[in-house]
Regions:
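Long amphipathic alpha-helical segments used for membrane anchoring, targeting, substrate engagement
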Residues: 1-68
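Extracytoplasmic low-complexity, Pro/Thr/Ser/Ala/Gly-rich segments
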Residues: 3-8, 48-113
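Active-site recognition of the HExxH zinc-binding catalytic motif
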Residues: 39, 94, 142, 165-178, ...
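Catalytic zinc-binding patch centered on the HExxH motif and its immediate surroundings
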Residues: 49-52, 117-143
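C-terminal capping/extension segments of zinc metalloprotease domains
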Residues: 62, 97, 121-135, 221-271
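Short helix/loop segments within enzyme catalytic domains
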Residues: 81-87, 91-93, 97-103, 198-250
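Short pre-active-site segment immediately N-terminal to the catalytic Zn-binding motif
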Residues: 148-165, 191-197
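Post-HEXXH active-site segment of zinc metalloproteases
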Residues: 177-201
Length: 271
């Protein structure tokens, strides 16, 4: 999926940080993070204590400079700039949806691109956790290195729309948090029809809503649509990224028996 070259981005919308290695993450996160933790545990046998827990520490210093992320052309050329413009487009889209379909106002989530580790309201996280949403501070966290892992470890294509889908999925969790959905479900209810899976599938649906409307979501600064209409091949990359983190795919990749009663994110087909 391609941004229109002339649309404008706000580099200040996204925070960056560089942290220390060997930190851990506390409970309460939402989104892809937990599924990636499970994948690492299954494929490597790594002790989860290094990934999940209360962990201390904090950000070690400033992260990547985003001052060059100004236009859609920059977003098409650089992954970090694609994140900036995607955040801008998601904010405009969800502000419109919330104002038209709910009585509440849209509050943008925080968005941090981090390297190695990051301190959050849910605890301290390493890059191994993957992208996640932390409801405690209403923020999305992402290490750009995950996109390479998406292809090398999970078997999906590291393509622009796949990247945008991942971010839009985490924004979907923010929408659930704003609407009270995240807090009203039993996230310990696992299995194909359990609350945990339903929460993830709804976030997928919200991501699809954004992608479906992206070519008609208008940059208020230029009056142009943020994005061009996606091609069928581009849509396939997003669907493949969603399927790649299906619980059954992860079990199979680890050489384990597929156990539907343990699912928290849904099967590849569901996603």
């Amino acid at each position: 999926m391609t941004f229109n070259d002339g649309v404008r981005g706000d580099a200040g919308r996204v925070r960056t940080s560089r942290g220390r290695r060997g930190m851990a993450i506390g409970g309460g996160l939402g989104g892809g993070g937990l599924i990636v933790v499970v994948l690492v545990m299954l494929l490597t046998g790594q002790d989860p204590a290094g990934l999940l827990g209360g962990g201390g520490g904090g950000d070690a210093g400033p992260g990547q400079d985003l001052s060059h992320c100004r236009t859609g052309a920059d977003a098409n050329a650089h992954t970090e700039c694609r994140m900036v413009l995607t955040a801008d487009a998601l904010d405009v889209y969800w502000d419109g949806v919330m104002s038209e379909q709910t009585t509440g106002a849209y509050t943008p989530p925080g968005f941090t691109i981090f390297t190695d580790s990051v301190q959050t309201g849910c605890g301290a996280a390493t890059s191994a956790v993957g992208p996640f949403y932390c409801p405690a501070d209403s923020s999305v966290f992402l290490d750009l290195g995950f996109f390479d892992q998406l292809e090398s470890q999970l078997g999906a294509q590291n393509a622009p729309l796949a990247q945008m889908y991942i971010v839009a999925h985490e924004w979907g969790h923010h929408t659930q948090h704003m609407l009270g959905t995240m807090e009203s479900v039993d996230r310990q209810d696992t299995g194909p029809s359990g609350d945990a899976v339903r929460l993830e599938l709804q976030a997928d649906c919200y991501a699809g809503m954004f992608i479906g409307a992206a070519a008609t979501t208008i940059d208020p600064d230029t009056g142009q649509a943020f994005l061009r209409e996606p091609t069928a091949d581009q849509v396939r990359t997003a669907l493949d990224a969603a399927a790649a983190v299906g619980d059954d795919r992860i079990h199979e990749s680890a050489g384990r028996e597929v156990e539907p009663h343990t699912w928290t994110h849904g099967s590849a087909e569901q996603r």
